[in-house]
UniProtKB/Swiss-Prot annotation:
Example GO molecular function: UDP-N-acetylmuramoylalanine-D-glutamate ligase activity
Enzyme Commission number(s) of this protein: 6.3.2.9
Family: Belongs to the MurCDEF family.
Annotated ATP binding sites: G119, S120, N121, G122, K123, T124, T125
Function: Cell wall formation. Catalyzes the addition of glutamate to the nucleotide precursor UDP-N-acetylmuramoyl-L-alanine (UMA).
UniProt-annotated location(s): Cytoplasm
Keyword vocabulary terms for this entry: ATP-binding, Cell cycle, Cell division, Cell shape, Cell wall biogenesis/degradation, Cytoplasm, Ligase, Nucleotide-binding, Peptidoglycan synthesis
Pathway: Cell wall biogenesis; peptidoglycan biosynthesis
Species in which this protein is naturally found: Streptococcus pneumoniae serotype 19F (strain G54)
Name assigned to this protein: UDP-N-acetylmuramoylalanine--D-glutamate ligase
Catalytic reactions of this protein: UDP-N-acetyl-alpha-D-muramoyl-L-alanine + D-glutamate + ATP = UDP-N-acetyl-alpha-D-muramoyl-L-alanyl-D-glutamate + ADP + phosphate + H(+)
InterPro entries named among the record's database cross-references: Mur-like_cat_sf, Mur_ligase_C, Mur_ligase_C_dom_sf, Mur_ligase_cen, MurD
Length: 450
């Protein structure tokens, strides 16, 4: 870890705990800052706040009192999940207090080169693929960021012999100023998190922050399958390296079933260890990064062939009497579910879908669900999903929760079929996050097998 003194004796407010806030508070304390932590959860129900207080860090819990900002803070570090419309953040900005997220802190202290991955879908799988390929090549990829390991925590243990592979959400990228990866990847961009950003343009702008400090010496890996992303290529100072399954590009591409990098075959598409056209795109992005980092083709091929996927991302769970169960709980939007379905024969799929109602209609999903064996629909968005099923001519049943949905899907399936949890919706109407939803699916499958 680089020792920096820019926070020494500075008063810093950490707004919101969870993993990233807790990590940021400890790091800032270590760097000599005078840290105050403010979290909305009551102290008695807040083990993170209790631990920080025991470590000598000031904590204020149970709400976000605006008068707290009457103190002269030099900086606010906010939890990524707290929107900029929060009154505390609005007041801080009005007072001229800089507002950052902890990935900025991670960048400032990291001795390791940074590869940043963002996008609407495919971030976690691509991040994991890149980390595994680099580690296999002796470059010791350390995963961090939105993938579940706070960037500021991992950066403290990273050395110049590691590579910091960061999954970055739009929430995190809104709060960067000096953040400067050597390689950045944008997997795709589609309307999501509009409830947080307000406008799709604001969401895209947040994602685009990943390249703000990049120069021609850095590489920006872009998905040329998508016109929106392709059009961004002319708006960066970085050297653009494209990937595509639709055209031959000066980067990584698919042609006649083979994955190429700049004219050289790396591996066959059907050798990738996980199914689906979206995973071909993820593999191409990984190949581009790996080749830019000097990894040989054999290492790339062996690693991607052995890749078993990521939990909750089209994860194979089990086979019960010839019925295969896949957990794709991370599919919280339409595009993700479209990608998941592309890897299967619809006539053999029982799809579990539905969740938080964000006001979306699901007409875009109609061509992709046409021909499904059956659907099991649940959640706040059930009526909207049912309308799409009716348009597609797909029979469905309703379920009360994930356990009920899993049991009903199994009853509808026969030998050779697939039960696919790919909700096309966020989980927050019923569950704290997609991980909880996916774990309940996995647990129910285990019960069915008993």
């Amino acid at each position: 870890m680089k020792v920096i003194d820019q926070f020494k004796n500075k008063k810093v407010l950490v707004l919101g705990l969870a993993k990233s806030g807790e990590s940021a508070a400890r790091l800032l304390d270590k760097l000599g800052a005078i840290v105050t932590v403010n979290d909305g959860k009551p102290f008695e129900d807040n083990p993170a706040a209790q631990c920080l207080l025991e470590e000598g860090i000031k904590v204020i819990t149970g709400g976000h009192p605006l008068e707290l900002l009457d103190e002269e803070f030099a900086l606010m570090v906010k939890n990524p999940g707290i929107p900029y419309s929060n009154p505390m953040i609005e007041k801080a900005l009005a007072k001229g207090i800089p507002v950052l997220t902890e990935v900025e802190l991670a960048y400032l202290i990291s001795e390791a080169p940074i590869i940043g991955i963002t996008g609407s879908n495919g971030k976690t799988t691509t991040t994991t693929m890149i980390g595994e390929v680099l580690t296999a090549a002796g470059q010791h990829g350390l995963l961090s960021g939105n993938i579940g390991y706070p960037a500021s925590q991992v950066a403290q243990i990273a050395t110049d012999k590691n590579t910091l592979v960061m999954e970055l959400s739009s929430f995190q990228l809104m709060g960067v100023q000096e953040f400067h990866p050597e390689i950045a990847v944008i997997t795709n961009l589609m309307p999501t998190h509009i409830d947080y950003h307000g406008l799709f343009e604001e969401y895209v702008a947040a994602k685009w922050n990943i390249q703000n400090k990049m120069t021609a010496a850095d590489f920006l890996v872009l998905n040329f399958n998508q016109d929106l992303v392709k059009d961004l290529a002319s708006k960066t100072e970085a050297t653009v390296v494209p990937f595509s399954t639709l055209e031959k590009v000066d980067g990584a591409y698919l042609e006649d079933g083979q994955l190429y990098f700049r004219g050289e075959v790396v591996m066959a598409a059907n050798e990738i260890g996980v199914p689906g056209s979206h995973n071909v795109e993820n593999a191409l992005a990984t190949i581009a990064v790996a080749k830019l980092r000097g990894v040989d083709n054999q290492t790339i091929k062996e690693t991607l062939s052995a890749f078993g996927g990521v939990k909750h991302r089209l994860q194979f769970v089990d086979d019960i009497k010839g019925v295969k169960f896949y957990n794709d709980s991370k599919s919280t939007n339409i595009l993700a579910t479209q990608k998941a379905l592309s890897g299967f024969d619809n006539s053999k799929v029982v799809l579990i879908a539905g969740g938080l109602d964000r006001g979306n209609e699901f007409d875009e999903l109609v061509p992709d669900i046409t021909g499904l064996k059956k659907m099991v629909i649940l959640g706040q968005s059930a009526e909207r999903v049912k309308r799409a099923a009716d348009k597609a001519g797909v029979a469905y049943v309703e379920a009360t929760d994930i356990a009920d949905a899993t049991r009903k899907a199994y009853e509808l399936a026969t030998q050779g079929d697939v039960v696919l949890l790919s909700p096309a919706n966020a989980s927050w109407d019923m569950y704290a996050n997609f991980e909880v939803r996916g774990d309940l699916f996995i647990d129910t499958v285990a019960e069915l097998k008993e």
